[in-house]
A protein has these predicted regions:
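Structural alpha/beta core scaffold segments of enzyme domains
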Residues: 1-403
Length: 403
Protein backbone atom coordinates (compact mmCIF):
# COMPACT_ATOMS: atom_id res chain seq x y z
CA UNK A 1 0.00 0.00 0.00
CA UNK A 2 2.81 2.40 0.84
CA UNK A 3 4.50 1.72 -2.51
CA UNK A 4 1.26 2.28 -4.43
CA UNK A 5 0.49 5.44 -2.48
CA UNK A 6 3.96 6.84 -3.15
CA UNK A 7 3.71 6.00 -6.87
CA UNK A 8 0.38 7.83 -7.13
CA UNK A 9 1.75 10.84 -5.26
CA UNK A 10 4.73 10.92 -7.61
CA UNK A 11 2.42 10.79 -10.63
CA UNK A 12 0.35 13.70 -9.31
CA UNK A 13 3.49 15.69 -8.49
CA UNK A 14 4.78 15.16 -12.03
CA UNK A 15 1.44 16.23 -13.52
CA UNK A 16 1.31 19.43 -11.49
CA UNK A 17 5.08 20.08 -11.47
CA UNK A 18 5.27 20.24 -7.69
CA UNK A 19 7.19 18.36 -5.00
CA UNK A 20 5.71 15.21 -3.49
CA UNK A 21 6.20 16.77 -0.06
CA UNK A 22 3.71 19.48 -1.03
CA UNK A 23 0.90 16.94 -1.50
CA UNK A 24 -1.49 15.22 0.90
CA UNK A 25 -3.88 12.28 0.54
CA UNK A 26 -7.29 11.85 2.14
CA UNK A 27 -9.89 9.21 1.24
CA UNK A 28 -8.22 8.45 -2.08
CA UNK A 29 -7.97 12.08 -3.17
CA UNK A 30 -4.60 13.80 -3.66
CA UNK A 31 -4.50 17.53 -2.91
CA UNK A 32 -1.93 20.26 -2.73
CA UNK A 33 -1.38 21.53 0.79
CA UNK A 34 -2.71 24.90 -0.36
CA UNK A 35 -5.91 23.17 -1.47
CA UNK A 36 -5.90 24.74 -4.94
CA UNK A 37 -5.67 21.40 -6.77
CA UNK A 38 -7.07 17.94 -6.16
CA UNK A 39 -7.49 14.69 -8.06
CA UNK A 40 -8.78 11.25 -7.11
CA UNK A 41 -6.74 8.08 -7.53
CA UNK A 42 -9.13 6.78 -10.18
CA UNK A 43 -9.05 10.02 -12.19
CA UNK A 44 -5.26 10.09 -12.00
CA UNK A 45 -4.98 6.55 -13.35
CA UNK A 46 -7.61 7.24 -16.05
CA UNK A 47 -8.20 3.54 -16.67
CA UNK A 48 -4.51 2.58 -16.79
CA UNK A 49 -3.15 -0.32 -14.75
CA UNK A 50 -1.00 0.52 -11.75
CA UNK A 51 2.12 -1.59 -12.19
CA UNK A 52 4.35 -0.76 -9.24
CA UNK A 53 7.35 -2.58 -7.83
CA UNK A 54 7.60 -2.91 -4.07
CA UNK A 55 9.64 0.00 -2.73
CA UNK A 56 11.11 -0.81 0.70
CA UNK A 57 11.91 2.89 1.13
CA UNK A 58 8.37 4.11 0.53
CA UNK A 59 7.35 6.18 3.58
CA UNK A 60 4.73 4.63 5.82
CA UNK A 61 1.75 6.57 7.06
CA UNK A 62 2.52 8.11 10.44
CA UNK A 63 0.55 6.51 13.26
CA UNK A 64 -0.56 9.99 14.34
CA UNK A 65 -2.40 10.29 11.01
CA UNK A 66 -4.42 7.09 11.48
CA UNK A 67 -8.14 7.78 11.67
CA UNK A 68 -9.43 4.19 11.99
CA UNK A 69 -6.52 1.90 12.96
CA UNK A 70 -6.37 1.61 16.73
CA UNK A 71 -9.89 2.93 17.21
CA UNK A 72 -13.06 1.14 18.25
CA UNK A 73 -15.24 1.67 15.19
CA UNK A 74 -18.93 0.78 15.31
CA UNK A 75 -20.15 -1.74 12.71
CA UNK A 76 -22.82 0.17 10.81
CA UNK A 77 -24.26 -3.04 9.31
CA UNK A 78 -24.90 -4.91 12.55
CA UNK A 79 -28.16 -3.21 13.69
CA UNK A 80 -29.97 -3.94 10.41
CA UNK A 81 -28.69 -7.52 10.36
CA UNK A 82 -29.91 -8.10 13.91
CA UNK A 83 -33.33 -6.57 13.28
CA UNK A 84 -33.89 -8.15 9.86
CA UNK A 85 -33.80 -4.89 7.90
CA UNK A 86 -30.57 -5.74 6.06
CA UNK A 87 -30.98 -6.45 2.35
CA UNK A 88 -29.54 -9.83 1.45
CA UNK A 89 -29.39 -11.22 -2.08
CA UNK A 90 -32.41 -13.41 -1.44
CA UNK A 91 -34.47 -10.31 -0.53
CA UNK A 92 -33.52 -8.22 -3.57
CA UNK A 93 -36.33 -7.27 -5.96
CA UNK A 94 -36.78 -5.25 -9.15
CA UNK A 95 -39.99 -3.76 -10.56
CA UNK A 96 -41.54 -6.11 -13.10
CA UNK A 97 -39.26 -8.94 -12.04
CA UNK A 98 -40.17 -12.47 -13.14
CA UNK A 99 -39.18 -15.68 -11.34
CA UNK A 100 -37.49 -18.69 -12.93
CA UNK A 101 -36.81 -22.24 -11.87
CA UNK A 102 -34.21 -24.33 -13.63
CA UNK A 103 -35.03 -27.82 -14.92
CA UNK A 104 -31.88 -29.93 -14.80
CA UNK A 105 -31.12 -33.34 -16.28
CA UNK A 106 -31.17 -36.28 -13.85
CA UNK A 107 -27.40 -36.69 -14.22
CA UNK A 108 -24.24 -35.23 -15.70
CA UNK A 109 -24.06 -35.06 -19.47
CA UNK A 110 -27.83 -35.31 -19.91
CA UNK A 111 -29.30 -34.38 -23.29
CA UNK A 112 -32.80 -32.92 -23.52
CA UNK A 113 -34.98 -34.98 -25.86
CA UNK A 114 -38.44 -33.46 -25.41
CA UNK A 115 -40.47 -31.08 -23.25
CA UNK A 116 -44.16 -31.32 -22.36
CA UNK A 117 -45.28 -28.07 -20.73
CA UNK A 118 -49.05 -28.64 -20.98
CA UNK A 119 -49.47 -29.14 -17.22
CA UNK A 120 -47.11 -26.28 -16.38
CA UNK A 121 -49.16 -23.86 -18.49
CA UNK A 122 -52.17 -24.47 -16.24
CA UNK A 123 -50.36 -23.02 -13.22
CA UNK A 124 -51.69 -19.59 -12.27
CA UNK A 125 -48.93 -17.06 -13.03
CA UNK A 126 -47.21 -19.13 -15.73
CA UNK A 127 -45.37 -16.99 -18.30
CA UNK A 128 -43.34 -19.29 -20.54
CA UNK A 129 -40.80 -22.08 -20.84
CA UNK A 130 -37.38 -21.11 -22.19
CA UNK A 131 -34.98 -23.54 -23.80
CA UNK A 132 -31.57 -23.25 -25.40
CA UNK A 133 -30.12 -26.65 -26.28
CA UNK A 134 -30.16 -28.49 -22.92
CA UNK A 135 -30.69 -25.32 -20.88
CA UNK A 136 -34.29 -25.42 -19.66
CA UNK A 137 -36.24 -23.11 -17.34
CA UNK A 138 -39.80 -22.24 -16.50
CA UNK A 139 -40.65 -18.54 -15.98
CA UNK A 140 -43.57 -17.30 -13.88
CA UNK A 141 -44.90 -14.18 -12.22
CA UNK A 142 -44.16 -15.41 -8.69
CA UNK A 143 -41.65 -17.71 -7.06
CA UNK A 144 -44.29 -20.16 -5.83
CA UNK A 145 -45.82 -20.32 -9.30
CA UNK A 146 -42.37 -21.10 -10.69
CA UNK A 147 -41.91 -23.89 -8.15
CA UNK A 148 -45.27 -25.46 -9.04
CA UNK A 149 -44.75 -25.07 -12.79
CA UNK A 150 -41.30 -26.65 -12.57
CA UNK A 151 -42.79 -29.64 -10.77
CA UNK A 152 -45.55 -29.94 -13.37
CA UNK A 153 -43.32 -29.68 -16.43
CA UNK A 154 -42.31 -33.01 -17.97
CA UNK A 155 -38.90 -33.26 -19.61
CA UNK A 156 -37.40 -36.37 -21.18
CA UNK A 157 -33.63 -36.72 -20.99
CA UNK A 158 -30.98 -39.04 -22.31
CA UNK A 159 -28.37 -39.38 -19.60
CA UNK A 160 -25.13 -41.31 -20.10
CA UNK A 161 -23.69 -43.26 -17.21
CA UNK A 162 -20.42 -41.37 -16.82
CA UNK A 163 -19.95 -41.44 -13.06
CA UNK A 164 -18.18 -44.27 -11.22
CA UNK A 165 -19.90 -46.16 -8.43
CA UNK A 166 -19.37 -44.51 -5.05
CA UNK A 167 -17.69 -47.64 -3.68
CA UNK A 168 -15.23 -47.65 -6.60
CA UNK A 169 -14.52 -43.91 -6.69
CA UNK A 170 -10.90 -44.08 -5.59
CA UNK A 171 -10.04 -47.05 -7.80
CA UNK A 172 -11.46 -45.01 -10.68
CA UNK A 173 -9.49 -41.95 -9.53
CA UNK A 174 -6.21 -43.86 -9.34
CA UNK A 175 -6.64 -45.22 -12.88
CA UNK A 176 -7.46 -41.92 -14.61
CA UNK A 177 -5.05 -40.73 -17.32
CA UNK A 178 -2.29 -38.51 -15.95
CA UNK A 179 -1.86 -35.11 -17.57
CA UNK A 180 1.36 -34.29 -15.77
CA UNK A 181 3.72 -35.87 -13.24
CA UNK A 182 5.71 -33.66 -10.90
CA UNK A 183 8.56 -34.62 -8.61
CA UNK A 184 8.09 -32.13 -5.79
CA UNK A 185 11.06 -33.46 -3.80
CA UNK A 186 13.60 -36.11 -4.72
CA UNK A 187 16.66 -36.58 -2.53
CA UNK A 188 18.82 -39.61 -1.77
CA UNK A 189 18.02 -43.14 -2.93
CA UNK A 190 14.44 -43.85 -1.89
CA UNK A 191 14.28 -47.37 -3.38
CA UNK A 192 17.33 -48.76 -1.57
CA UNK A 193 16.54 -46.84 1.62
CA UNK A 194 13.08 -48.40 1.86
CA UNK A 195 14.42 -51.84 0.95
CA UNK A 196 16.99 -51.66 3.74
CA UNK A 197 14.71 -50.19 6.39
CA UNK A 198 14.12 -52.17 9.58
CA UNK A 199 10.43 -51.27 9.48
CA UNK A 200 8.16 -49.97 6.74
CA UNK A 201 4.87 -48.18 7.42
CA UNK A 202 2.28 -47.58 4.70
CA UNK A 203 -0.99 -45.64 4.66
CA UNK A 204 -3.46 -44.41 2.06
CA UNK A 205 -5.71 -41.42 2.67
CA UNK A 206 -8.68 -40.46 0.52
CA UNK A 207 -10.58 -37.19 0.55
CA UNK A 208 -14.10 -37.26 -0.84
CA UNK A 209 -15.66 -34.61 -3.09
CA UNK A 210 -17.22 -31.87 -0.99
CA UNK A 211 -19.96 -29.34 -1.56
CA UNK A 212 -19.83 -26.01 0.21
CA UNK A 213 -23.46 -26.37 1.32
CA UNK A 214 -23.97 -22.69 2.15
CA UNK A 215 -26.84 -22.05 4.55
CA UNK A 216 -28.81 -20.20 1.87
CA UNK A 217 -28.99 -21.76 -1.60
CA UNK A 218 -27.71 -19.53 -4.39
CA UNK A 219 -29.78 -16.65 -5.71
CA UNK A 220 -29.29 -13.98 -8.38
CA UNK A 221 -31.23 -11.32 -10.28
CA UNK A 222 -30.42 -10.23 -13.83
CA UNK A 223 -31.84 -7.56 -16.13
CA UNK A 224 -30.91 -7.87 -19.81
CA UNK A 225 -31.93 -4.86 -21.91
CA UNK A 226 -30.57 -2.58 -24.62
CA UNK A 227 -27.88 -5.09 -25.51
CA UNK A 228 -26.38 -5.17 -22.02
CA UNK A 229 -26.96 -6.96 -18.75
CA UNK A 230 -26.92 -5.94 -15.09
CA UNK A 231 -26.52 -8.79 -12.62
CA UNK A 232 -27.02 -8.63 -8.86
CA UNK A 233 -25.08 -11.48 -7.30
CA UNK A 234 -23.30 -12.64 -4.14
CA UNK A 235 -20.40 -13.92 -6.27
CA UNK A 236 -16.95 -13.62 -4.72
CA UNK A 237 -15.35 -13.24 -8.17
CA UNK A 238 -17.43 -10.71 -10.08
CA UNK A 239 -14.49 -9.92 -12.40
CA UNK A 240 -14.21 -13.54 -13.50
CA UNK A 241 -17.99 -13.94 -13.64
CA UNK A 242 -18.25 -10.91 -15.90
CA UNK A 243 -15.90 -12.59 -18.39
CA UNK A 244 -17.83 -15.88 -18.28
CA UNK A 245 -21.20 -14.17 -18.71
CA UNK A 246 -19.79 -12.39 -21.75
CA UNK A 247 -19.24 -15.80 -23.33
CA UNK A 248 -22.67 -17.15 -22.38
CA UNK A 249 -24.59 -14.04 -23.49
CA UNK A 250 -22.34 -13.42 -26.51
CA UNK A 251 -21.87 -9.74 -25.72
CA UNK A 252 -18.72 -7.75 -24.78
CA UNK A 253 -17.93 -7.96 -21.08
CA UNK A 254 -17.95 -4.15 -20.98
CA UNK A 255 -21.73 -4.41 -21.53
CA UNK A 256 -22.13 -6.45 -18.34
CA UNK A 257 -22.42 -4.71 -14.98
CA UNK A 258 -21.95 -6.75 -11.83
CA UNK A 259 -23.42 -5.49 -8.55
CA UNK A 260 -22.46 -7.34 -5.39
CA UNK A 261 -25.16 -8.05 -2.81
CA UNK A 262 -24.44 -9.94 0.42
CA UNK A 263 -25.51 -13.56 0.34
CA UNK A 264 -24.75 -16.89 1.97
CA UNK A 265 -20.98 -17.18 1.81
CA UNK A 266 -18.44 -19.92 1.34
CA UNK A 267 -14.68 -20.35 1.33
CA UNK A 268 -14.06 -21.15 -2.30
CA UNK A 269 -16.77 -21.16 -4.94
CA UNK A 270 -20.33 -22.43 -4.56
CA UNK A 271 -23.33 -21.94 -6.85
CA UNK A 272 -23.50 -18.12 -6.85
CA UNK A 273 -21.75 -17.83 -10.21
CA UNK A 274 -23.84 -20.56 -11.84
CA UNK A 275 -27.08 -19.11 -10.51
CA UNK A 276 -26.03 -15.72 -11.90
CA UNK A 277 -25.45 -17.34 -15.28
CA UNK A 278 -28.92 -18.90 -15.11
CA UNK A 279 -30.57 -15.56 -14.33
CA UNK A 280 -28.64 -13.68 -17.02
CA UNK A 281 -29.42 -16.16 -19.80
CA UNK A 282 -33.10 -16.48 -18.87
CA UNK A 283 -33.41 -12.68 -18.73
CA UNK A 284 -31.87 -12.45 -22.19
CA UNK A 285 -34.26 -15.08 -23.54
CA UNK A 286 -37.44 -13.53 -22.06
CA UNK A 287 -36.49 -9.84 -22.30
CA UNK A 288 -37.36 -8.99 -18.69
CA UNK A 289 -35.64 -8.86 -15.28
CA UNK A 290 -35.49 -12.36 -13.80
CA UNK A 291 -34.80 -13.74 -10.34
CA UNK A 292 -33.44 -17.28 -10.02
CA UNK A 293 -33.55 -18.95 -6.62
CA UNK A 294 -31.92 -22.35 -6.32
CA UNK A 295 -33.48 -24.93 -4.03
CA UNK A 296 -31.41 -27.07 -1.66
CA UNK A 297 -31.42 -29.92 -4.18
CA UNK A 298 -30.06 -27.55 -6.85
CA UNK A 299 -27.26 -26.40 -4.57
CA UNK A 300 -26.15 -29.84 -3.44
CA UNK A 301 -26.70 -31.46 -6.80
CA UNK A 302 -25.31 -28.87 -9.20
CA UNK A 303 -22.83 -26.59 -7.49
CA UNK A 304 -19.21 -27.34 -8.45
CA UNK A 305 -17.55 -29.70 -6.00
CA UNK A 306 -14.05 -29.92 -4.66
CA UNK A 307 -12.42 -32.87 -6.44
CA UNK A 308 -11.34 -36.06 -4.67
CA UNK A 309 -7.77 -36.43 -3.46
CA UNK A 310 -5.87 -39.68 -2.99
CA UNK A 311 -2.59 -39.85 -1.06
CA UNK A 312 -0.29 -42.89 -0.75
CA UNK A 313 2.38 -42.58 1.94
CA UNK A 314 5.23 -44.84 3.02
CA UNK A 315 8.00 -44.38 5.57
CA UNK A 316 11.06 -46.46 6.41
CA UNK A 317 12.49 -46.60 9.95
CA UNK A 318 15.91 -47.75 11.09
CA UNK A 319 16.55 -50.08 14.04
CA UNK A 320 16.29 -47.21 16.52
CA UNK A 321 12.92 -46.11 15.12
CA UNK A 322 14.23 -43.02 13.35
CA UNK A 323 12.87 -42.22 9.85
CA UNK A 324 15.38 -42.87 7.08
CA UNK A 325 13.05 -42.75 4.08
CA UNK A 326 9.82 -41.00 3.10
CA UNK A 327 7.77 -41.55 -0.04
CA UNK A 328 4.42 -39.97 -0.88
CA UNK A 329 2.25 -39.90 -3.99
CA UNK A 330 -0.61 -37.47 -4.53
CA UNK A 331 -3.38 -38.07 -7.08
CA UNK A 332 -5.01 -34.69 -7.63
CA UNK A 333 -7.12 -32.94 -10.26
CA UNK A 334 -5.33 -31.03 -12.97
CA UNK A 335 -6.48 -27.41 -13.10
CA UNK A 336 -6.65 -27.04 -16.87
CA UNK A 337 -8.18 -23.58 -16.67
CA UNK A 338 -7.34 -20.31 -14.97
CA UNK A 339 -9.46 -18.54 -12.39
CA UNK A 340 -10.88 -16.53 -15.30
CA UNK A 341 -12.16 -19.73 -16.91
CA UNK A 342 -14.73 -21.72 -14.97
CA UNK A 343 -17.49 -23.34 -17.03
CA UNK A 344 -20.90 -22.10 -15.87
CA UNK A 345 -23.84 -24.49 -15.98
CA UNK A 346 -25.56 -22.04 -18.31
CA UNK A 347 -22.65 -22.41 -20.73
CA UNK A 348 -22.42 -26.19 -20.48
CA UNK A 349 -26.15 -26.73 -20.97
CA UNK A 350 -26.74 -24.05 -23.62
CA UNK A 351 -24.06 -25.47 -25.90
CA UNK A 352 -21.27 -22.95 -25.29
CA UNK A 353 -17.98 -24.84 -25.26
CA UNK A 354 -15.77 -23.81 -22.37
CA UNK A 355 -12.35 -25.14 -21.55
CA UNK A 356 -11.05 -25.93 -18.16
CA UNK A 357 -12.13 -26.18 -14.59
CA UNK A 358 -10.48 -24.48 -11.67
CA UNK A 359 -9.62 -26.65 -8.70
CA UNK A 360 -7.44 -24.45 -6.53
CA UNK A 361 -3.90 -25.24 -5.44
CA UNK A 362 -4.36 -28.87 -4.49
CA UNK A 363 -0.62 -29.54 -4.42
CA UNK A 364 0.00 -27.22 -1.46
CA UNK A 365 1.76 -28.91 1.47
CA UNK A 366 2.59 -31.96 -0.61
CA UNK A 367 6.23 -31.31 0.17
CA UNK A 368 7.81 -32.56 3.41
CA UNK A 369 8.93 -30.01 5.97
CA UNK A 370 11.11 -32.51 7.86
CA UNK A 371 14.72 -33.34 7.04
CA UNK A 372 15.08 -37.00 6.06
CA UNK A 373 18.06 -38.48 4.19
CA UNK A 374 15.87 -40.04 1.49
CA UNK A 375 12.67 -38.39 0.23
CA UNK A 376 10.52 -38.80 -2.85
CA UNK A 377 7.28 -36.85 -3.23
CA UNK A 378 5.35 -37.09 -6.49
CA UNK A 379 2.20 -35.33 -7.65
CA UNK A 380 0.11 -36.96 -10.38
CA UNK A 381 -2.13 -34.37 -12.01
CA UNK A 382 -5.10 -36.22 -13.48
CA UNK A 383 -6.48 -35.24 -16.86
CA UNK A 384 -10.17 -35.39 -15.98
CA UNK A 385 -12.49 -35.22 -12.98
CA UNK A 386 -15.79 -36.54 -14.47
CA UNK A 387 -17.65 -33.58 -12.95
CA UNK A 388 -17.33 -29.81 -12.61
CA UNK A 389 -14.93 -28.82 -9.88
CA UNK A 390 -14.01 -25.72 -7.95
CA UNK A 391 -11.75 -24.80 -5.09
CA UNK A 392 -12.72 -25.67 -1.54
CA UNK A 393 -10.57 -22.97 -0.09
CA UNK A 394 -8.03 -24.22 2.40
CA UNK A 395 -4.73 -22.53 1.57
CA UNK A 396 -2.38 -25.30 2.64
CA UNK A 397 -4.70 -28.08 1.57
CA UNK A 398 -6.20 -29.71 4.62
CA UNK A 399 -6.15 -33.15 3.03
CA UNK A 400 -2.41 -33.02 2.32
CA UNK A 401 -1.63 -31.57 5.73
CA UNK A 402 -3.69 -34.21 7.52
CA UNK A 403 -2.07 -37.05 5.58
Amino acid sequence: CASARQALLSAAAMRWQVNVADLTVHDGVISTRQGDRKISYIALLDGAALNVKLDPKAPLKAYTDHKIVGQSIARVDIPDKVTGKFLYMHDFKLPGMLHARMIRPPGLGGKLLSVDDSAARKVNGFVKVVRKHDFLAVVCQSEWAAVKAARALKAQWETPNTMPEQAKLYDYWRKLPVAKNEAVIKTGDITNALAGASQRIKATYDFAPHTHGSIGPSCAVADFKDGGCTVWSASQATHSLQAELSTVLEIPKERIRMIYVDGAGCYGRNGHEDCSGDAALVSQLVGAPVRVQWMRADEHGWDPKSPPTLVDMEAGLDASGMPVAWRSEFFIAQANGTLEEFPLLAAVLSGVKRKGHYTGNLQKNADVLYQFPNIQTEVHRLADTAFRTSHLRTPGRMQNTFA
